[in-house]
């Protein structure tokens, strides 16, 4: 990968499938950008719900090959001019008009559809600007907000219409309602917000 002198050489290196699971993003001085959902999916029988328990007595369900490199999600030079990859749904990595169509890919690939807060914020910020200079790029890079589309915010928002028995809890809800979802040092609402969010994060990771 590091020895590649062109996009084609980089793609050839990735075609080796030596480092799977990590998404790949390429950019060069010729204004090429490329996204690769770097998975290695089994070539499975169609028409089977592979998310559920599979009949282990059927030899026709045993797979012995992997899906070809060309069949995994990849985007080359989207017209939007940007790609944002943060461990998210491979069909939501650039502007909506340039994203791949999930219907073009077999469900047997088992592609993830999870969206992270970083993914939501990256897309929101990149689509906000028609042109991105150094100032705008720094603002995107050092953004410290939660997205209202994120699981994290929705977890907190579920509390907004609830009435609690104590003044302390109701005051806490008011603090969360006033929070602008930023986590800068001076933000006095962030401490409670992030503390509440920790339970959602642990739950998502399957630790509780």
Indicate residue ranges for each PLM-predicted region:
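Alpha/propeptide regions of enzymes that mature by internal proteolysis
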Residues: 1-16, 122
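Short alpha-helical segments and helix-capping/turn motifs at coil-helix boundaries
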Residues: 7-11, 19-21, 64-71
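Long, compositionally biased non-active-site segments enriched in small/hydrophobic residues and glycine
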Residues: 28-208
């Amino acid at each position: 990968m590091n020895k590649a002198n062109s996009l084609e050489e980089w793609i050839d290196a990735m075609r080796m499938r030596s480092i799977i699971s990590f998404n790949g993003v390429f950019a060069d001085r010729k204004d090429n950008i490329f996204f690769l959902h770097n998975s290695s999916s089994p070539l499975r029988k169609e028409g089977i719900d592979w998310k559920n328990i599979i009949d282990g007595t059927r030899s026709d369900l045993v797979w012995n090959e992997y899906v070809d490199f060309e069949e995994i999600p990849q985007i080359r030079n989207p017209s939007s001019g940007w790609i944002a990859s943060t461990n998210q749904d491979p069909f939501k990595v650039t502007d909506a008009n340039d994203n791949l169509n999930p219907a073009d890919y077999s469900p047997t690939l088992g592609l993830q559809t999870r969206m992270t807060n970083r993914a939501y914020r990256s897309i929101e910020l990149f689509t906000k600007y028609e042109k991105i200079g150094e100032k705008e790029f720094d603002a995107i890079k050092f953004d410290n907000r939660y997205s209202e589309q994120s699981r994290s915010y929705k977890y907190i928002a579920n509390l907004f219409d609830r009435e609690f028995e104590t003044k302390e809890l109701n005051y806490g809800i008011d603090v969360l309602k006033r929070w602008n979802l930023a986590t800068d040092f001076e933000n006095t609402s962030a401490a409670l917000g992030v503390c509440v969010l920790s339970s959602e994060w642990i739950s998502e990771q399957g630790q509780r």
